[in-house]
């Protein structure tokens, strides 16, 4: 039985914190071969994929509020007396699942994924890129036979990035379509879905969101988000600024007023505490011109954009329009889409972002095995777009997780899948060499490191600056 989420069930935000790269967060074309249709609900099975693709590199190996009382508990301790399942140190109590038998039933024939996405609305164009990458990776795996013969069927439903529609989609996916896992975009949809999917013991795998509340494995054991943890990225941002301004600096924040933007802003402010950096102004970026004016008036040295994929270009352009050139502009990882910087022109020169994805358009990576695999699988015109790469990565993480579950003693079951998702140290082919996706029974690290990239207006590309910066906490 699906439950009402109550007053804390979801975060209302008009835009998704989209995956670029990142995400970064910073996306649904119609076709007969796995694309989402134009109707609000469409099914896209990628079983009939191209017959030949290279083998995948790498073997399988915050909103506050009370916790969800109905969600099955998880721990990394010894097995409890109630029915449960454990592997790799992670344990879930299946006795509290809405359908305990379903949680441990071995999946054969087809593995169904229910994808609630904004196929319409203001962010649909960006989501198209991510879904192109996602579909291509799934299709390539199906063409090779799937997961030990089990094909992956991705079914899409439009939520227009409205939490209530995402929740309605979830109900259909679980009760009518009987999917094996879910995925979605954005903080609002994740919040709308988390309670019910945990009660149903249906994994939510690699959703484009990073709300601190749903990173609490003890309360949301079946929810796995994709985007970098806000506190980890904020520590990176503060480190970059301190390196350039060892004697301190005045920082201004251009803050998107969604849950995603406010979450980034709060994490950044928390990371700045105890340093010699002063937060001198926080300006809503709803009106970029007003934000730029406020930041200039505050006389800040550094501008940090706490926002989503579509924010960074307009903020930089607004700064240029009023003749304000900060000494440094730091953008979040979800602003790695180069098209926004090209549109901003010379004003974007020198902007800094953290990245973790390889750039398939970089000539220096032409012979990279991961890039070669990616380009062989993704044939759409947007294949060099960072957001497309991020979508591909989300699917690749899912595939690696399913392979790992299938090879485990628990097998390809809902329990086996979430156990595998909580036991990852995976160097996906499109992660920058040296970066891994890391997850343990007690903590979702996600991306283990970032690399600093600086935008060059002259070459219209990002240029790497220095080596990897570890954010895993080790």
Residue positions per predicted region:
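Segments of small-molecule ligand-sensing domains
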Residues: 378, 384-388, 399-461
